[in-house]
Amino acid sequence: MSEVITKSNTAPKVGFVSLGCAKALTDSELILTQLSAEGYQTSKTFQGADLVIVNTCGFIDDAVKESLDTIGEALAENGKVIVTGCLGAKTAEGGGNLVRQMHPSVLAVTGPQATQEVMDAVHANLPKPHDPFIDLVPNAFGVAGIKLTPRHYAYIKISEGCNHRCTFCIIPSMRGDLVSRPIGDVLKEARALFEGGVKELLVISQDTSAYGVDVKYRTGFWDGKPTKTRLLELAAALGDMAEPYGAWVRLHYVYPYPSVDDLLPLMAAGKVLPYLDVPLQHSHPEVLKRMKRPASGEKNLERIQRWREVCPDIVVRSTFIAGFPGETEEEFSHLLDFMREAQIDRAGCFAYSPVQGAVANDIGGMLPIELREERRARFMAVAEAVSSAKLQQRIGATMQVLVDSAPGLGKKGGLGRSYADAPEIDGVVKLLPPEKISKTLRVGEFTKARIVGAQGHDLVAQPF
């Protein structure tokens, strides 16, 4: 993030660091929008800042360490630090706030989705400018506000929190139970994003499939029309809205409830991308029971096969955990067999990490870290073989590619993504120089490209 908005040379400056997942990123965007609306300058560096805000992650141990280290660096370089995010809600082993215990000199600590609390702390330590010409309300920037992503794609969070209590996860203790955003608010933000040039909208939450469950799918309103607060209606409305802009809508964190089947016709019709990010975590029924996964009784293999019958182009992405407490070699082999048979297009895998506060730590049967890592490596070898074979099948096909990078207007090629590739987590399409000398590639625009090769998780394509 470069300096976001400069109000004046004398406006107080806030350094800002955003760590963690896409959900945390949207929290950062809300805070940055409010800061800018009130006349503060913002910067991604500590130098020259009057204070620093660190939005933290507290899910796994590596993320906790990164967050604590970043807070320490900010204190050392600047001295005035406000901490927000998931780590801010975490309790230390002996009780008390973990951040306060490790860094007692921070100015304030809040949990996630706490824009007002963060702003209160900023006001207490760095009074806002009182200039009527720059002291704006957030809507002056458009409802979409400031975004930390490139201009051509954006995340939109449709709910906060989660009603599930998976034994490996501590997110509900930090972000609370499911709270769905009013459907009218979501669609208003989406329209502002499309109007602002966004070509790919990535729908995120902790549990996208559960959107509206907490409000019993009550009817909201959009453009004066009644619209049910439910994922199917939201996806359909987003697809209709995106169409005039030629934009993509991509769904993430979609739990495999039966209701997900209703989305497939929208994908087959091209309303939303035929791409499902489904966090399955494992395949063996006993492991899923120990994980207390929602929809653990679903026959996921049959579900995926049925999805492909309805929408042959669908790409299924998922994440898995290897070495969960008590996992036997038979249970792990079941997972490998599932990967081969389900042919998951894009897969990630984590070796189980005993996150502080997770119920799974007390299940018993903790596996040695060496075995957990060995199983993760074995899983990824299978996943990469599946992915490579599926990418080879695309050679010779023509695909629409969203250009992410194109130095010199693409005269020497560039990088982009197809519908099968979400930013940051999937592969890319390596673009060769266009066939025609007159053709240019521009970031944020689509190009047709012929797939000519595959390299690892990536495709190689010739724009035309």
UniProtKB/Swiss-Prot annotation:
Per UniProt, the keywords (alphabetical) are: 4Fe-4S, Cytoplasm, Iron, Iron-sulfur, Metal-binding, S-adenosyl-L-methionine, Transferase
Domain Radical SAM core: from-to ranges: 148-390
Q: Where does [4Fe-4S] cluster 1 bind?
A: C21, C57, C86
**GO MF, any single term:** aspartic acid methylthiotransferase activity
Q: What is its main location?
A: cytoplasm
What does the entry give for GO biological process? tRNA modification
Q: In the UniProt record, which is one GO cellular component term?
A: cytosol
What's one Pfam family the UniProt record gives for this protein? Radical_SAM
Where the record annotates domain TRAM, the positions are 392-464
Q: Which domain of life is it from?
A: Bacteria
> What does the entry's cofactor note say about binding and number?
Binds 2 [4Fe-4S] clusters. One cluster is coordinated with 3 cysteines and an exchangeable S-adenosyl-L-methionine.
This protein's cofactor list reads:
[4Fe-4S] cluster
- What EC number(s) does this enzyme carry? 2.8.4.4
Spell out the family assignment given in the record's similarity comment: Belongs to the methylthiotransferase family. RimO subfamily.
Provide the function of this protein. Catalyzes the methylthiolation of an aspartic acid residue of ribosomal protein uS12.
Q: Could you identify this protein by its name? A: Ribosomal protein uS12 methylthiotransferase RimO
